[in-house]
Amino acid sequence: VIESHADARYSFGKFKKKHFGPSGSWEAQVCELPNLRHLRVFQAVARLGSISGASREARVSQPAVTQGIAKLEAMLDVVLFERRQSGCYLTEYGRAYLARTDRMFAEMEGGLVAPRVGPPFADDKSLKSILAKTTATHVRALMAVAEHRSIETAALKLGISASSLTRAARDLEGVLRRTLFHPGLQGLTPTKPATELARRFGLACRELTYATEEIATLKGMSTSRVVIGTLPLFPVDLIARSVDDVLRIYPGTRVLVVEGAYLSLLDDLRAGKIDFLVSVLRRPNWAEDVDEEPLFRDPYAIVARRGHPLSRCRNITLQDLARFEWVLPELGTPRRMAFEHMFAGFSPKPKTSIETRSIEFQRGMLSTSDRVSIVTRQETMLEERIGALAALPFAPPVSRNADGIATRANWRPTIVQLAFLDLLRRNSRDILSIPQSAVPSSDQRGQVTPRWPALPVTGPAKRRERALVGAMPRS
């Protein structure tokens, strides 16, 4: 792709087509970013309702405006405007694309004017000029370097020359009049403000990915991709049932479930690599750009192998449990903190020489020994169905945070994502033990439900949704 002004000096054709993951992956977000000038012209035509008005505002010829709109329509394979003698009017697809385009530029503007790290890159006076000079190639270059942590490593991973990537990165520095990269052990590496700006640019690109998915859904041929983050020990039944339900409504949907450590998943959520996080709610204070919605409370239980010596006891005490070795996750995790709280001031404390987050490894260590562990009630039910472990008759004297959904603040779900969230809420009622007043009702979930109404589901997808929801039991 060769864009206006500085882009005439270098091409990112290979960068775009060959070296990123499949469409819908986080890396592919940069590939789906069209010419930013075309997007700005599209906004102008939508706002002014005419080609001539947009031409005057953008200071380009009317044929250039027409060509820019035509390229967007060809890329999306839809008609964005109805052309009439009285002007240009957005179609249903055009309205969907405009909403996401507006959000994309708002995200970019926020990253430039109000970054979370370092001083602003722009103020109200310089913002318009900087946005006009920033190109899709600049965005791709910054995101690639931030992802791979150095220009040299990014160029090697992408199969392009370091000089081409360096020119794009340096040109962006000239546009912003800020140093974005500094020498490191692996060559030029991004500064912290540059890494944060790349994150905001990534979220901006994600809006256009959502736009293409919403347009496909409106056409009755959903190709949406839902990326869910979850912890290794989170109740799998809830997610599995919700995935199965959403695939019946939108058969073309691709669902990716990513397991990992909480803080790693939180970073992925904030960067737009995952759409939402389903886990125990434990947002740190610094993550002000993340919202949480409680769904249910899953209390702790103590598990051991079937036939464990304590399974025959009626009144188990902490002294009894302290005689056995424990298998636990590492320090700082909720279950480990619950264990530490249980045995606070207890001497001697139980032996804890084995640390793991792996369900399979924990099951193996417990099923072949007299070791014990602390898990949730839902995890206990799963282990009992498998037949490997059983709950001991002991109620841990510790409370547990609610489980629920974490999303980016001001996030606007796609049609399919919104359906998946509603299915999570519906299915979570089967294990709901939180007081109903503590769980937002459908009209109180401002943290997850978009501030704008979701685009209406029409055609075959709507009929499938009605059929499935009507068949579901209501609590």
Question: Residue spans of the language-model regions?
Answer:
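Central regulatory/effector-binding core of bacterial HTH transcription factors
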Residues: 148, 153-163, 224-282, 475
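Short beta-strand-centered segments that line the small-molecule binding cleft or hinge
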Residues: 2-5, 13-14, 133, 263-300, ...
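A short LG(V/I)-centered, amphipathic sequence patch enriched
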Residues: 73-90, 173-190
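Interdomain hinge and pocket-entrance segments immediately C-terminal to HTH DNA-binding domains
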Residues: 115-138, 217-235, 250-253, 299
